[in-house]
Amino acid sequence: MIAAAAAALVIGAGTLGGVVGTQLAGSRTSTAGSSTSTAIAVALAAGQTLSTAQVASVVSPSVVTITATGNRQTSEGSGIVLSSNGRILTNNHVVAGSTSRGGRGGPIAIEVTLANGKKANATVVSQDATHDLAVLQASGVSGLTAATIGTGAAVNVGDSVLAFGSPLGLEGTVTAGIVSAVNRSIDSGGSTLTNLIQTDAAINAGNSGGPLVNAAGQVIGINVANATASNGSGSIGVGFAIPVSTAIGMINGNVG
């Protein structure tokens, strides 16, 4: 638990407004040349770890930005592509205000911005408020690059990790760090999230729902929250992600 006197827990998908509401336009897709792609394929086939740049190249096409608009609020977060036809994993709190199931604002609109800059409408197909997870379906999309889910991948303190997402509306952002701790519990919005991965990779408002990945480019967690100093400043190197083991049931149930 985080002591309230020391740090305030901030859910990673901020309400739009002020600087959080200033989303940069344009695509930030990272493409790799043929020689780089071949090197990555060889490394993955051999079970080797990748460089930070290689991991970013592999994972970035599978990360989306989510803008959810309800009657009372608009929130922004990130998501992980689960299938080529547009199934997307994110945090429930990113879309809860825009859905009738558990949302205050009533259903209005959810828009997904893909890694190539294209936009698509989306609907919620599954929610798990207890574990802060949701699965979306993007409309009219095909040929998307699904992320590699690290089912069974070991998560050890000290492992190198990268966090992906759209902090403060900055699409295509990648931050690096390590696994700082495992099995953390935090109090979030009146509920308790358990078995979380703690990382010092920067996680800020807008990162929620984005992937935390290991050095093999496998998704090992879903970014969910960060701790801030009492003055409300940005990342202080204490971020949290829901482990894939918690989400695997929802993933398997929605990707066939």
Segments the model singles out, each with a brief description of its role:
Residues 69-75, 83-172:
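Conserved active-site neighborhood of the chymotrypsin/trypsin-like protease fold
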Residues 64, 158, 179:
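Conserved hydrophobic/aromatic pocket- or pore-lining residues that grip, position, or stack substrates
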